[in-house]
Amino acid sequence: MNQKCSLVAIVGPPNAGKSSLLNNWLNKKISIVSSKPHTTRNNVFGSVTKEDTQVVFVDTPGFAKKHGVWGKHLQKSMYESLKDVDTILLVIDSLSPFKLGTEILFDVAKKTDANLLVTVHKTDRPKKSKLYEIGRWLKESKSYEDPIFLTSTNTKTGTEKLLDKIVSLAKEGPWLFDKDQDTNLTKEWIGAEYVREKVFQSIHQEVPFNIAVQPTEWDFNSEKWVLRVRLLVRTLSHKKIIIGKKGFKLQQIGSAARAELMSLWGPGQLFVEVVKDNQFEETIKELYYSS
């Protein structure tokens, strides 16, 4: 069997649905999802293997303005993902399609040698007139004549058709992952990211953007898995918010993450502690983008 392989960068503005598409194709959640922008902080790799063809997706952070440490890292991480990829998949949010990031990413992608595919996502929600408006903008303003894929992970509409197109563009070459390996993330980091997701879903305002997660101890070889995760925060006030009155909020976060991890791995234990990190900026550099 002659192997085929393709490296595909999934790009788009924050909260466009990039992680949802990747999780849909993997049929499991490796890239966390929330309604807040900038949930994805690093490039997350996920691989889908169909017969002789392997597609390795790079789920990138949403395009961010260069404000602060996070903004600079997110933008750098996104641009780095476009180097040496075979295909760029631009995800346009049908509910807010004309963001600055959408246009910038389209222009950047057109300057590369990669194939460019465009999907308008969340198409189960806007009016048809909005979809026509997006198509007109791509054709008239961006001279984009190729087919536009309409997708929704909520209704599973168009996602397989788009995946088939991506697979068809793969060229002959060795696979990058073993057939049974579907991500570059280790189990302990997947678990830690699930905890971070629950913080995003449970805590509002600026707090979720001022935390980092770190797996500290784990055992996946016993009958019941054990994972300890440290939630690092910038300030004592953030720590108090996450812990909540009588520890209720932290218990809620831990219970929600544990329930999802048990559905993924079976019975196990998750322990979460919250720590104020006096070297927070240095820690997040080391954890998320030291490379």
List PLM regions with ranges.
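Catalytic P-loop NTPase motifs of RecA-like helicase/translocase cores
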Residues: 40, 64-65, 97-98, 126-127, ...
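Active-site glycine-centered loops adjacent to acidic/histidine catalytic or metal-binding residues
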Residues: 59, 121, 152
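P-loop NTP-binding site
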Residues: 187-291
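Conserved C-terminal guanine-recognition region of P-loop GTPase G domains, centered on the G4
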Residues: 49-54, 73-146, 219-224
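Conserved, well-folded catalytic cores of nucleic-acid-processing
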Residues: 28, 47, 51, 81, ...
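Conserved glycine(s) of the Walker
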Residues: 17, 158, 249
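Canonical P-loop GTPase G-domain recognition
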Residues: 114-115, 124-186
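Conserved G1/Walker A P-loop phosphate-binding module
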Residues: 1-83, 232
